[in-house]
Every structure is written in C-alpha cells, then in structure tokens.
Design a protein with these regions (language model features):
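Start-transfer (signal-anchor) and selected internal transmembrane alpha helices
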Residues: 1-28, 120-123
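Specific aromatic-rich, kink-prone transmembrane helix
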Residues: 113-117, 149-161
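Short acidic/glycine- and proline-prone juxtamembrane loop motifs at membrane-interface regions
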Residues: 141-149
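Transmembrane and membrane-interface helices of multi-pass
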Residues: 105, 124-137
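Transmembrane-helix motifs of polytopic, lipid-linked glycan transferases
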Residues: 95-123
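Extracytosolic helix-loop segments that constitute the early lumenal/periplasmic catalytic or substrate-binding loops
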Residues: 36-67, 71, 81-88
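Helix-to-loop transition at the C-terminal end of transmembrane segments
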Residues: 22-42
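Hydrophobic alpha-helical transmembrane segments
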Residues: 11-15, 74, 102, 127-129
Length: 161
C-alpha cells in the first residue's frame, strides 16, 4: 500500500490538525482513560495472563475498566508499554496514558491515510471534514473514547475489498 505522503504533508490544514491533536494528547487526560482504560492495560503489562479481564476483576479492578475485546487490547499494548517504561524511568505515571492516546492518534491517522488512498481526488475535503472534524476530536482526544480503533479496522476492511 503506497500512499503519497506529500499530499498530506504539504497541506497546512493537516499540520493544524496534527498539532492540535498532539497538544490535546499531551495536555488532556480524559477521565475514562485515567480511571478505567489505562489502569487495565497497565495491569496486563505488569501481570501478563491469558485471562486479563478475569485477573483484573479478581484483584478488585472496576468491571467497567476495559469493556473491549482482545484486538483492542493488542492495539493499545505497544504504545502503553513504551509509556509504561518511560514512567518507570522518570518515576511518574503520565506516559502510559500518553501512549494510550498516541495509539488512538495512530488509528486516526490510519483512517485518514486509507480514506486518502481510496478517494485521492478529495484530499483537501478529507482533511477538512474528517481530520479536522470537531466530533472526532472531541470523542477521541477530549472525552477519551477508543471508537477510532474499530473504525480503523472497518475502513481497512473496506479498503481491502
């Protein structure tokens, strides 16, 4: 899958959206991620098991913590692991959450790239209406929901048809 990055990289609206999303990733800590999602993924990193949901509940974890399946967990694990290692180096618990949010940004970027590949005539419209969508930005980067990950799988499936 070859994607011409130039069409995105040279668009100032792409840069505006990317900068805004990075700033939100660094400055906003959504409550659902802080209280539920990130602690669950960190518990999987600290105590790997074949049944992470059962183990998390047995250790007194919140049943609402991570109501997603294995694919969602596998998507989140690499970036959270990198953040977790950085947390250990610096002695804080900040970068695990940043890693979680970076994985959402990567899924968001994947959706944009696939849409650009499928609809190359409409690059500017895709950037303006998808990449800069206030709904997407609010749901993903402000509220902290992970819906962009299954959306990226859906768009990837459509792309591969």
């Amino acid at each position: 899958m070859s994607i011409d990055w130039k069409c995105l990289w040279h668009d100032p609206f792409f840069h505006i959206g990317l900068l805004a999303k990075i700033v939100l990733i660094l400055l906003i800590v959504p409550t659902v991620q802080e209280q539920w999602f990130v602690p669950f993924v960190v518990s999987v990193i600290e105590q790997p098991t074949l049944s992470p949901w059962t183990q998390f509940l047995q250790q007194g974890g919140d049943p609402l913590a991570f109501p997603y399946g294995l694919m969602m967990l596998l998507v989140q694990l690499p970036a959270v692991l990198i953040g977790y290692l950085a947390d250990g180096i610096f002695g804080i618990s900040y970068f695990s959450g940043v890693g979680f949010r970076v994985s959402l940004l990567l899924a968001d970027l994947l959706v944009l790239l696939l849409l650009v590949k499928m609809f190359s005539k409409y690059v500017r419209k895709l950037i303006v209406y998808y990449w800069l969508s206030p709904i997407l930005i609010y749901i993903t980067y402000w509220h902290g929901q992970t819906d962009i990950i299954p959306v990226s799988f859906l768009v990837l499936g459509l792309f591969l048809l």
